[in-house]
């Protein structure tokens, strides 16, 4: 059995005035911005800070808590268990201009219309689809689940 290093993170599901969703591209997959909580930091503040750092967005407004997702990964010769607290966020006007944080491996930041989401979410992690499902987004906007024959 692995002994996991537990990590807390905050992330954001950001929308703009047009109702578009913000996605980032990292390691060849579409993702939502998120990052590690600093010692003593409120997790909502973590989510805001990380979204701003990874996307260049300004004047974000923190909205309601969505859900917590968990995933594991192997880095620096040990297993990590990351708990991510997800929040809705909004931005307005020029505060919605984006700049990818390339030093974190983010190659693109893109605003995506709801009708296009399923296409983008075919290339993401299952936990990211769960965040969208948690806000009650209709299944027609999510990637179809392939059944094993």
Question: Each predicted region: which residue ranges?
Answer:
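Unchanged
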Residues: 37-126
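Charged phosphate-binding loop/patch that engages nucleotide di/tri-phosphates or the phosphate backbone
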Residues: 124-149
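Acidic, metal-coordinating catalytic segment for phosphate/diphosphate chemistry
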Residues: 1-11
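C-terminal lobe/hinge of AMP-binding adenylation domains
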Residues: 26-27
């Amino acid at each position: 059995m692995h002994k996991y290093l537990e990590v807390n993170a905050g992330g954001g599901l950001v929308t703009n005035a047009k109702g578009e969703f913000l996605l980032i591209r990292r390691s060849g997959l579409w993702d939502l911005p998120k990052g590690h909580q600093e010692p003593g930091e409120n997790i909502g503040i973590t989510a805001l800070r990380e979204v701003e750092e990874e996307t260049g967005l300004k004047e974000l407004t923190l909205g309601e808590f969505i859900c917590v997702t968990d995933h594991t990964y192997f880095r620096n010769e040990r297993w990590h268990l990351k708990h991510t607290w997800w929040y809705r966020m909004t931005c307005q006007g020029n505060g919605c201009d984006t700049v990818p944080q390339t030093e974190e491996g983010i190659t693109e930041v893109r605003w995506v219309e709801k009708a296009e989401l399923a296409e983008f979410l075919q290339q993401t992690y299952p936990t990211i689809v769960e965040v969208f499902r948690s806000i009650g987004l209709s299944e027609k906007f999510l990637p179809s689940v392939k059944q094993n024959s």
